[in-house]
């Protein structure tokens, strides 16, 4: 019996070492050598080295001088340990009510915005972690941000244009804007004194969720 079991046990041990140890270590080593920033989580740092967040995971912004991210259904919001969408169908009454409430809140906070509220500002992504919004969603918020910063709207629009990322490989996906990067660019152009809101760190604050 042992004669029949030995090849199977040997194969299990070999595959465990190969796929559970050697392969992950090799992939990690190659990633750290070829893509050190991405392998470390695409972290964004302040000049003093303090981590402000990741370019891959969104954050919640609520202050008027910042661009706001799309809603998140991941835990209490952008919780990577609870990545998820709402799992509610488009006709679900709870989803319809939530979207309508978001529309009204955004209109109240953006009285000078032109046109309907962009859909990505009132709907969560499938992961709940999306760090991007559409250029249209950023432009829709531009009047509010410009007023809060004391800037001309055209200057804010130019920052949006500079922060817009094109399609992957030129044809995959749609143009998008990384909200954290855009807000940091705003701080660099027109810093404003502020206090962080409890549970909602803003750019420049050394807290990552």
From Swiss-Prot:
This is Potassium-transporting ATPase KdpC subunit. HAMAP family: KdpC. Belongs to the KdpC family. It comes from Rhodospirillum centenum (strain ATCC 51521 / SW). Pfam families: KdpC (PF02669). Residues 188-209 are annotated as: Disordered. One of its GO terms (molecular function) is ATP binding. NCBIfam families: kdpC, PRK00315.1.
């Amino acid at each position: 019996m042992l004669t029949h079991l030995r090849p199977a046990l040997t194969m299990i041990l070999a595959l465990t070492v190969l796929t559970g140890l050697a392969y992950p270590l090799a992939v990690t080593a190659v990633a750290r050598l070829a893509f050190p920033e991405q392998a470390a989580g695409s972290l964004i740092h302040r000049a003093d080295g303090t981590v402000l967040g990741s370019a891959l995971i969104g954050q919640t912004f609520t202050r008027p001088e910042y661009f706001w991210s799309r809603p998140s259904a991941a835990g209490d919001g952008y919780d990577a340990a609870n990545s998820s969408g709402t799992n509610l169908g488009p006709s679900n009454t709870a989803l319809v009510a939530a979207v309508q409430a978001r529309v009204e809140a955004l209109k109240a906070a953006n009285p000078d915005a032109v046109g309907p509220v962009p859909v990505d500002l009132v709907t969560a992504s499938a992961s709940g972690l999306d760090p991007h919004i559409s250029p249209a969603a950023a432009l829709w918020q531009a009047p509010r941000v410009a007023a809060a910063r004391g800037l001309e709207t055209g200057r804010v629009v130019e920052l949006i244009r500079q922060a817009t990322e094109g399609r992957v490989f030129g044809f995959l996906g749609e143009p998008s804007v990384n909200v954290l990067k855009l807000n940091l660019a705003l701080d660099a152009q027109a810093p404003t004194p502020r206090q962080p809101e409890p549970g909602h760190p803003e750019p420049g604050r050394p807290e990552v969720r």
